[in-house]
A protein has these predicted regions:
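Bacterial N-terminal signal peptides that target proteins for export
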Residues: 1-12
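Intrinsically disordered, low-complexity regions enriched in Ser/Pro/Gly/Gln/His and often acidic
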Residues: 2-4, 17, 31, 355
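Bacterial N-terminal signal peptides
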Residues: 10-20
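Sec/Tat signal peptide C-region and signal peptidase I cleavage site
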Residues: 21-25
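Cell-envelope and extracellular/periplasmic
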Residues: 26-555
Length: 555
């Protein structure tokens, strides 16, 4: 087969796929004139608690969302004892300097469709589905009838102005407070299904699609209420599995506000809320046949067939994922601008956010985070490439909403958070894929960054080294590599009063002292952090360099 014919066939296939994708979207959404109305409802993490509109400018992908979106209609009732009401339709914008997920949702959806959109929002912190949102016997703040009245009055105003509309989707984020009532917790799944059923009845929309936001496991409650949170998630998943018009929206990979003291928090805060909204937007767009994922294929094969390849496994939590390192900041960092470009000489495979985003096989190394973010893999790969000869492949497995006990072979009672089997399967798959392409693979090591949240809570901090040791030992057994090197990097642990008595650094150092293939990397000279736990762009770059240099010193 000639090269010209292969190129022609590839072009025809590409055009066919593009046409088919466009056709599917048109078939599902033939009307670009009708106003599409979305309902947002829930408790504090739907309100946007502990966020600040003035902070949006800090996060490059979301700059400008503090300004009104004049083409998006907004009707709301937000708060508790004294609700903050729009009293009709207004332009979409932050309410009382608070950032809700509707801001980024609206911009993302508006960028992808021609139809006008509108948002109706009712949210109130500290409320329960079992009481406040109960459609049959509402109590407390009686939010079900209040929200129904808000929706009906908002739609009546559209009718009065003869604006054609359709209710397009219902975004729901709630459940934290139900876990503290045994009856509400046990019945959350049944209550949620009843909630969906009653909305479809009362809004006369039998095919209304619901998007159910996950309770974020990165929060304080994700740690000290693991079992309670698991029970609520199980209820959510029961509904989204049994109801074909309900979709579970993962959020545990989203940013979490940095609290005082040790840094842990209950709320997403500004960045997390903006990412939260993108999650809903992407899910809705998939529903109507629009996939915003950008393909990142190799232009040419990164290394010759049959050539040896060193495989580096990167693993960890918030900073290995790159929660607050933005590609948009690279142009400001002299000497690092090129990291924003794909490196066609290094193969990269990833499974990040606990499977929220997975690469399409092997791609060129480059920024591939969730929201214009990246991790230490970029500078790690660049440093290795400049200092060591040979072919390089990097496979990254992370979940920023996990803790170190989620990575142990034993796992925890929150079974949907047990990562060890997936982690080992990911490593084996990475090796197998490279070997299937004719490469001779050497597993150079596992490069793991210690869980940031684990060092910020006493019970976790005390067990961190023990959990890590269990994971290291079992990985060597399951990969049949008794001498497998683990490079364990650690940033300075939080120094809140009461935590200092648990010397997590010494505990990890003791593991290294007893194991010649366990290298403890004390990354204590990184650029100063803006807040506890999370490292920003410049620090993530330095972390990658520090890890790479440690490998070069110990290879």
């Amino acid at each position: 087969m000639s090269q010209k014919f292969r190129l022609f066939r590839a072009c025809v296939l590409f055009v066919s796929l593009v046409f088919a994708t466009s056709l599917r979207a048109q078939e599902k959404n033939p009307d670009d004139k009708t106003l599409r109305v979305f309902i947002f409802a829930g408790q504090s993490n739907m309100v946007g608690s502990d966020s600040k509109a003035a902070d949006i400018v800090k996060f490059p992908p979301f700059v400008g969302l503090d300004e009104p979106q004049k083409k998006v209609k907004f009707s709301y009732s937000i708060g508790r004892e004294e609700m903050n009401n729009s009293n009709g339709w207004v332009d979409l914008q932050p309410v009382d300097n608070v950032v809700g997920p509707e801001l980024s949702f609206a911009r993302k959806v508006s960028q992808e469709i021609k139809a006008p959109i509108a948002i109706i929002k009712c949210a109130s912190g500290g409320t329960t589905l079992g009481a406040d949102w109960n459609p049959d016997e509402p109590s407390g703040f009686s939010l079900y009838p209040l929200t129904l009245k808000l929706i009906q009055s908002s739609l009546a105003e559209l009718d009065k102005k003869r604006i054609p509309y359709r209710i397009e989707g219902f975004m729901w984020h709630q459940g934290e407070n139900d876990m503290f009532d045994e009856k509400f917790k046990a019945n959350y799944g049944a209550n949620l299904q009843n909630f969906l059923t009653k909305w479809r009845r009362d809004l006369k929309t039998p095919n209304l699609k619901f998007y159910i936001g996950e309770l974020c496991t990165k929060s304080v409650w994700g740690m000290d209420n693991r079992d309670n949170m698991y029970a609520i998630r199980a209820g959510q998943k029961f509904v989204t599995t049994s109801d074909k018009l309900a979709e579970y929206i993962p959020t545990s990979h989203d940013a979490m506000e940095i609290g005082g003291g040790a840094g842990l928090h209950y709320h997403y805060g500004t960045l997390g809320q903006l990412e939260h909204g993108v999650n809903y937007a992407d899910a809705y767009l998939r529903t109507i046949g629009i996939n915003t994922t950008v393909a990142r294929p190799f232009k040419v094969r990164p290394f010759p067939q049959g050539a040896p390849v060193k495989l580096f496994i990167l693993a960890g939590h918030r900073n290995m994922e790159g929660e607050r390192a933005f590609t948009g900041d690279l142009s400001k960092l002299k000497g690092y601008e090129s990291l924003a470009n794909d490196n066609q000489k290094i193969a990269y495979k990833y499974n990040i956010g606990g499977g929220f985003k997975v690469s399409n096989g092997w791609e060129p190394l480059g920024p591939a985070g969730f929201y214009g973010t990246f991790g230490p893999e970029l500078s790690f790969g660049a440093t290795l490439q400049s200092k060591a000869p040979g072919n390089i492949a990097i496979a990254k497995f992370t979940h920023s909403g996990s803790q170190m006990n989620d990575w142990t072979p034993e796992g925890t009672e929150a079974k949907d958070r047990n990562l060890y089997p997936q982690f080992i399967a990911f490593i084996k798959e990475s090796i197998k894929e490279l070997e299937g392409k004719g490469q001779k693979v050497e597993l150079a090591g596992i490069f793991y960054h210690v869980g940031e949240n684990d060092t910020a809570m006493g019970g976790y901090r005390n067990q961190a080294a023990k959990w890590l040791q269990s994971t290291v030992a079992k990985s060597r057994e399951d990969l049949s590599l008794p001498g497998l090197k683990w490079f364990v990097s650690q940033q300075p642990p939080t120094d809140q009063e009461g935590l200092g008595t648990i010397d997590v650094t010494a505990n990890i150092a003791a593991l290294a002292a007893a194991d010649p293939n366990f290298i403890h990397i004390k990354a204590f000279d990184l650029p100063k952090q803006d807040a506890e736990l999370v490292i920003t762009t410049e620090g993530i770059i330095k972390l990658g360099e520090v890890i790479a240099r440690s490998y070069l010193e110990h290879k």
